[in-house]
Amino acid sequence: MSLRTPPLFDAHTDAGAKLTEFGGWEMPVEFDSIRTEHDAVRESAGKFDISHMGEIEVSGPDAAALTNRLTTNDVASLAPGEATYAGITDDDGVLLDDTVVYRLPDGATYLFVPNAGNDELMAERWRSFADRWDLAATVDNATDDYAMVALQGPDALELLSSLDVDVFDLSRFEAAERTVAGVDCLVSRTGYTGEDGVELLFETAAAETVWSALDCQPCGLGARDTLRLEAGFLLGGNEFDPETNPRTPYEANIGFAVDLGTEFVGSDALAAQREAGPDERLVGLRLQDRGIARHGHDIVAAGDVVGEVTSGTMSPTLGAAIALGYVPVEYTEPGTELAVVVRGDEKDAVVEALPFYE
């Protein structure tokens, strides 16, 4: 099966980007170096092609009701131009995906952004439940119709201002229609880096126009991963996977994205888990010894395996090896001393409150 390519693929290859497969897409992993790109976002601004993320539009009289019953947060309460972070769970409360849901400025359409490679799966899920519940909603997988670019960093909003695009009035998780380099865009004050910034959604044909107008460091998936890990953000396929690592929002530390005042697929199971408390939870780990924890490495306490690393890296900002992983709740208190097995050797590690960087 051939890989999907983003609208900016030619621009990336012309720039000499190193490419990698991710979620069925061929995407840039780095342009210059992960460290250069990471530091640009922490210190000034960087731009990311995130067109591999899905865009699913839901419209019709029951669009809000359908989306509210399939996501863990209170989507029905969104005002036009507002967005929220939510999980998508099965009957057991297990995360199938995490997403940002927008109520578009027109007030009539909802847009949600599933992770790379999940767009058609999630579109079909919405259609199936609309039929099952006899809800009047139209579900359109618009992933191939749009390009999506993230502009992140402390100077991101000033950079847009230099293009006569003012978004300082937008609060976090607010979106508005703006014109960038002559292109109509949906601009939201959201991101996946732990920095301020925006994400821009616009028609595919205008991708190179918008990309070239944003005069800052291009960044690939490598820096996107180190940045999100420092911020303690989840990565689907690592921190949760319904097949290989089934986790609930409470286990994955995104209970803030669950509103049990709404009724959704999995809400009964999650209400029960919140009452009882999860047996395991995601924690941050900072290694004390030389070595880098990686996905799949064992976490040990007093020589016994108690958990597994889901993501790990050498943090460019902190100058330390950091990781995320699941352990029983008795080991989740910050300051708890554990170890990670790296190449057969136990490396001392300490549980650290998330995020690592804020």
Curated annotation (Swiss-Prot):
Q: Which Pfam families match?
A: GCV_T, GCV_T_C
**An example Gene Ontology CC term for this record:** glycine cleavage complex
User: Enzyme class, one word?
Assistant: transferase
Q: Name one GO molecular function term.
A: aminomethyltransferase activity
Provide the reaction this enzyme catalyses. N(6)-[(R)-S(8)-aminomethyldihydrolipoyl]-L-lysyl-[protein] + (6S)-5,6,7,8-tetrahydrofolate = N(6)-[(R)-dihydrolipoyl]-L-lysyl-[protein] + (6R)-5,10-methylene-5,6,7,8-tetrahydrofolate + NH4(+)
Q: Which InterPro entries match?
A: GCS_T, GCS_T_bac, GCST_C, GCV_T_N, GcvT/YgfZ/DmdA, GcvT/YgfZ_C, TrmE/GcvT_dom1
Q: Which domain of life is it from?
A: Archaea
Q: What is its EC number?
A: 2.1.2.10
Q: Which UniProt keywords apply?
A: Aminotransferase, Transferase
Q: GO biological process: any one?
A: glycine decarboxylation via glycine cleavage system
Q: Which Gene3D superfamilies match?
A: Probable tRNA modification gtpase trme, domain 1
Family that this chain belongs to = Belongs to the GcvT family.
Function, as annotated, reads: The glycine cleavage system catalyzes the degradation of glycine.
Which proteins does it associate with, and in what oligomeric form?
Answer: The glycine cleavage system is composed of four proteins: P, T, L and H.
PANTHER family in alphabetical order: AMINOMETHYLTRANSFERASE, AMINOMETHYLTRANSFERASE, MITOCHONDRIAL
State what protein this is by name: Probable aminomethyltransferase
Lineage per the UniProt record: Archaea, Methanobacteriati, Methanobacteriota, Stenosarchaea group, Halobacteria
